């Protein structure tokens, strides 16, 4: 269980914000193919943000710890980022919190935004060694990185995939 909410204000708000919602994408999976819509959702978010693939500086992965879903997510991200995927710091919060189901993407976003604010790529709790089938750049330790753009992706039961690009204010 979990919950999270955001107050989204206009860009010209007098109060300082954590980040800009720069771009968004959403796609559905093809019948029976897990995470098949994730590539399109992430690609759409980057395009919608007006960014290039190379502008993605950090990834907050769905990373549920399920071998099939983790591999499918990683394959989608490999298809999008190619060989540069190993150079993009990534993390997942599922090892710390488990899955909060519908609240998980909002909680992921909060973690990603706090990391961006504090110039950190958060650690992936309970992660210890690289899976040969997954080329995400995960770490068991927090890493310092002053990053301006973070991609947060999610995959829901029933095949809904979403991705958001947040950019530092």
Label the model's feature ranges.
Residues 1-51, 57-58:
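Condensing-enzyme catalytic core mediating Claisen C-C bond formation in acyl metabolism
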Residues 1-13, 102-169:
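Conserved beta-strand-centric core segments of catalytic alpha/beta enzyme folds
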Residues 8, 22, 78, 91, ...:
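Residue-level detector of conserved, well-ordered beta-strand and adjacent loop positions
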Residues 23-35, 60-71, 87-136:
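Acyl-CoA/ACP chain-elongation machinery
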Residues 37, 41-50, 76, 80, ...:
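Stable alpha-helical structural segments in soluble proteins, enriched in small hydrophobic residues
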Residues 53-55, 85-87:
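Short acidic capping loops at alpha-helix termini that bridge into adjacent secondary structure
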Residues 55-56, 147:
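Local beta-strand N-terminus motif with an aromatic residue
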Residues 69-83:
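Active-site-proximal gating segment of KS-fold condensing enzymes and close homologs
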């Amino acid at each position: 269980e979990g919950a999270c909410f955001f107050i989204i204000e206009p860009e010209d708000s007098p109060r300082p914000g954590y980040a800009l919602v720069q771009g968004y994408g959403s796609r559905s999976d093809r019948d029976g193919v897990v995470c098949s819509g994730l590539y399109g959702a992430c690609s759409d978010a980057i395009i919608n943000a007006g960014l290039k693939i190379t502008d993605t500086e950090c990834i907050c992965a769905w990373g549920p710890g399920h071998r099939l879903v983790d591999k499918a997510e990683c394959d989608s991200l490999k298809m999008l980022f190619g060989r540069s995927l190993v150079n993009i710091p990534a993390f997942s919060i599922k090892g710390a919190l488990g899955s909060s189901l519908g609240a998980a993407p909002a909680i992921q976003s909060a973690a990603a935004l706090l990391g961006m604010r504090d110039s950190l790529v958060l650690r992936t709790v309970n992660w210890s060694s690289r899976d040969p089938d997954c080329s995400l750049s995960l770490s068991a330790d927090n890493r310092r990185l002053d990053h301006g753009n973070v991609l947060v992706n999610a995959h829901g039961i029933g095949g809904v995939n979403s991705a958001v690009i947040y950019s530092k204010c």
